[in-house]
């Protein structure tokens, strides 16, 4: 699963290079109905707390019904800082016998300004519970950009060297210097 996530992030890095006018990534995180309800509600509550869409840009057509009392969730998620609150979330989710889904975990650590628009039920995809998000490319942590964009550029240069040897001869070391 983690290798697949790396491929996903490398793909987003490629999009950023191939489509430099792209400012936002709009997508979703998926959890399935079998996932622990209380853990799901706690994750949703955490996402609202730290990534709420205050402008109400998007709303789900068929929103998730949060079944866990807000008072309970507030008693668990007591920190104002993301990192400290995340530790509390992770501990409680594990206590409930599950882990935070890897994709959800990855998105939460991608950008401090991610917007979460709420979760909804996708009736056309096995009743999957999908949470809509928006990430500004400019706000993605530099370490994440470097890791996934650099790999794309290196792969692109390797491809050019192999596919167009005459171009490489004409460019000489300049092509290598472009990615060094």
Where in the sequence are the language-model features?
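Extended effector regions of multi-domain proteins
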Residues: 98, 128-132, 138-140, 166, ...
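Short, intrinsically disordered/low-complexity patches at protein termini
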Residues: 33, 48-49, 139-141, 154, ...
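Acyl-donor binding region in acyl/amide transferases
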Residues: 1-114, 118, 125
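C-terminal/domain-terminus segments
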Residues: 104, 115-153
């Amino acid at each position: 699963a983690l290798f697949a996530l790396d491929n996903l992030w490398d793909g987003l890095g490629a999009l950023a290079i191939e489509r430099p006018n792209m400012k936002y990534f709009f997508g979703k995180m998926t959890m399935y109905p079998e996932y622990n309800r209380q853990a799901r509600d706690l994750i949703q509550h955490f996402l609202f707390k730290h990534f709420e869409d205050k402008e109400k840009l998007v709303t789900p057509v068929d929103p998730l019904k949060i079944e866990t009392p807000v008072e309970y969730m507030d008693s668990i998620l007591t920190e104002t800082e993301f990192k400290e609150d995340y530790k509390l979330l992770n501990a409680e989710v594990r206590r409930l016998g599950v882990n935070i889904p890897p994709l959800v975990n990855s998105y939460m650590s991608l950008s401090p300004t991610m917007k979460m628009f709420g979760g909804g039920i996708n009736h056309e995809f096995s009743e999957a519970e999908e949470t809509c998000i928006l990430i500004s490319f400019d706000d993605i942590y530099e370490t994440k950009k470097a890791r996934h964009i650099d790999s794309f550029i290196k792969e692109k240069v390797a491809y050019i060297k192999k596919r167009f040897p005459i171009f490489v001869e004409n460019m000489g070391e300049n092509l290598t210097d472009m990615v060094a």
